[in-house]
Curated annotation (Swiss-Prot):
One Pfam family this sequence matches: DUF436
Disulfide bonds: none
Signal peptide: none
InterPro entries documented for this protein: Antibiotic_NAT-like (IPR028345), DUF436 (IPR006340)
Taxon lineage: Bacteria, Bacillati, Bacillota, Bacilli, Bacillales
Protein name per the record: UPF0340 protein SAOUHSC_02355
SUPFAM superfamilies: TTHA0583/YokD-like
Entry's family note: Belongs to the UPF0340 family.
Organism, scientific name: Staphylococcus aureus (strain NCTC 8325 / PS 47)
Amino acid sequence: MKDLTMLLDELKDMSFFNKGDICLIGCSTSEVIGEKIGTVGSMEVAETIFNALDVVSKETGVTFAFQGCEHINRAITIEKSQYNPLTMEEVSVVPDVHAGGSLATYAFQHMKDPIVVEHITVPCGIDIGQTLIGMHIKHVCVPVRTSVKQVGQAIVTIATSRPKKIGGERAKYQ
């Protein structure tokens, strides 16, 4: 997928991926192939996307988390090494193509030691196909603009975050 490679290269050039961070991926493989979200799914597309992200992870030190679909309440597949019991709650579900989505399913099958958590708060994310990842992005969510607007037929939305500005008119900010 040339557009995926271009998108990831552009984000690397922008220093979007930071070593030690967790970047959330939401993806409708149905949308990537031009179908309605949640209808046909593609493990082949999931494999391509997962493998491209794995390369980015090795190059930059970022870790990826994978959002499941609404049928599993948009739960997140992560490596167990990223699990923090103080801020995350593990849930008992295994993503499936028809309840979790193809990419979360593929990730669960190919990660070293995957677990699924109910919620996560991450500093950045890539939404491929309007899967609504915003509920897992740290406040304050900030859109990131790139020249790549789609992966396949799916609309891409990218977000990062910044600290909240609090204190009112007398406050000073960095």
